[in-house]
Amino acid sequence: NRVLPFFVPHARTRGFLLLAPQSMFVTWDIVIGGHGPDLQRLDQALAMVAAHFRLDPARLAFAGFSDGGSYALSVGVTNGDVASHVIALSAGFMNTFTQAGRPRVFLAHGRSDSQLPVEASAPAHARRLLESGHDLTLQPFDGDHVIVPWVVGRAIDAFLGPPST
């Protein structure tokens, strides 16, 4: 998993749970043809975690990078009655069939992303999110199609608030 190592230190320091589901296919089902078994697996995994831990509905984020960022953005905005926050890193697309609730969204993208060019995605995502009333933090950064540690730190602060001192 390319994403988890960037979030684990924050989870340990700030005291939150991480659920890291994997797609059933080479990438998330929505990328290759709509919601299917990945969404069902995510629902089941979230229900299993909720059966063992008390979850704060005001602090439940869907997060991901690249195709996972697109999936988090699409599923999180569609299910804003479940997710209070969305952290989308280098998301290429946002596919929202319907929207429930209005999760807060942290959207980050590298200015020189060679795989998913920023100009083809982030501005359009930001416009759609703002037009539909979402609280949006847009975080461009200097870099390619990568996860940047300080950006993840900002995303966690947007999710949980700044750390207490």
Residue positions per predicted region:
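Primarily recognizes the serine-hydrolase "nucleophile elbow" in alpha/beta-hydrolase
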Residues: 50-52, 58-102
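Short amphipathic alpha-helix adjacent to the substrate-entry channel of hydrolases
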Residues: 1-19
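Short beta-to-alpha linker loops that shape the active-site pocket of alpha/beta-hydrolase fold enzymes
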Residues: 22-26, 92
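Loop/turn elements at helix/coil->beta-strand transitions in domains of secreted/extracellular proteins
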Residues: 13-18, 56-60, 81-85, 101-105, ...
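Stable alpha-helical elements in mature extracytoplasmic
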Residues: 3, 7, 38-45, 68-72, ...
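Solvent-exposed, acidic/flexible segments
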Residues: 31-39, 65, 76, 98, ...
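C-terminal catalytic histidine-bearing segment of alpha/beta-hydrolase fold enzymes
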Residues: 106-108, 114-165
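Gly/Ser-rich "nucleophile elbow"/oxyanion-hole loop immediately N-terminal to the catalytic nucleophile
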Residues: 29-66
